Regions:
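Outer-membrane beta-barrel channels and translocator barrels
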Residues: 20, 62-66, 118-122, 187-189, ...
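Positively charged n-region of N-terminal signal peptides that target proteins for export
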Residues: 1-4, 18-20
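Acidic/histidine-enriched, beta-strand-rich ligand/metal-binding domains
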Residues: 67-70, 74-80, 104-106, 116-122, ...
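Short glycine/proline- and aromatic-enriched beta-strand/turn motifs that initiate or cap beta-hairpins
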Residues: 19-56, 233-237
Length: 237
């Protein structure tokens, strides 16, 4: 067993030394979606989209015959907004109009297995799949309410990570997704895009399952993301 372990380490070291390595920067568009799935309907309820930007560093290593790995460190920002809309509550006479503004900030560490195939000199198409660890920094909504004649108004801000603010719907800061995608590379320039599926329930389970959905443990949330990135490799071995 010891010999096998040593051989595996030596083999990985040799492959890494022979790999075609790139280090670069990337930026692009990200659209994150919070979803609530129920087993009864089979559909996503209350999806909320956040449009934003992604920027970060990427390491790309082609190890053998087009197969390799990419790793990155990204910062992602997203925001959404609603138009003024009517609401039906006991306060309707005082504040019948509401709107909201939301935003989130997070750090991401993607690790993807990748296959590149060369279609022309120093020109490749690529396919990739792999997990991403997301760590939330800020996730908040701000609500605005006003009367029809705009004489009365107030604002209210909620921290979606706070149990005090969100009661039964507080979110976890850590999330894991699994992504699939494709891309194109010409010399040092590349374009990559894909979709990340949330693997864990982002809602704090003891509140979300036991309080809001008691007796239905299969009801869960998801935090997904569309993304497309442009980049340039600044260093190549």
């Amino acid at each position: 067993m010891k010999r096998i372990s040593i051989l595996a380490v030596v083999l990985m070291t040799v492959l890494t030394l022979q790999a075609q390595d790139y280090i670069g920067v990337q930026f692009g568009y990200a659209r994150s979606l919070t979803r609530l799935n129920t087993p009864e309907s089979g559909k996503s309820l209350n999806p909320t989209g956040y449009n934003g930007l992604k920027v970060g560093f990427v390491y790309d290593a082609t190890i053998v015959k087009g197969f390799g790995v990419t790793m990155g460190l990204n910062y992602t920002f997203g925001a959404n907004a609603t138009d003024w809309m009517k609401k039906a509550t006991i306060q309707q006479g005082l504040y019948p109009q509401i709107r909201s503004r939301g935003q989130y900030h997070q750090v991401e560490i993607p690790v993807d297995w990748q296959y590149k195939f060369e279609i022309a000199k120093r020109t490749w198409l690529m396919l990739y799949t792999g997990p991403t660890l997301q760590c939330g920094l800020i996730f908040k909504d701000k609500w605005y309410a006003r009367s029809d004649n705009k004489s009365n108004a107030f604002t209210h801000e909620e921290n979606l990570y706070s149990e005090e603010d969100m009661e039964d719907y507080a979110l976890k800061r850590l999330n894991v997704t699994w992504g699939i995608g494709a891309g194109f590379q010409y010399e040092r320039y590349f374009l990559r895009g894909g979709y990340d599926f949330g693997l864990i329930n982002p809602y704090k389970a003891y509140q979300f399952t036991e309080v809001v959905n008691d007796g239905n443990p299969r009801t869960r949330g998801r935090f997904d993301q569309w993304q497309i990135k442009l980049g340039i490799y600044l260093w190549e071995k």
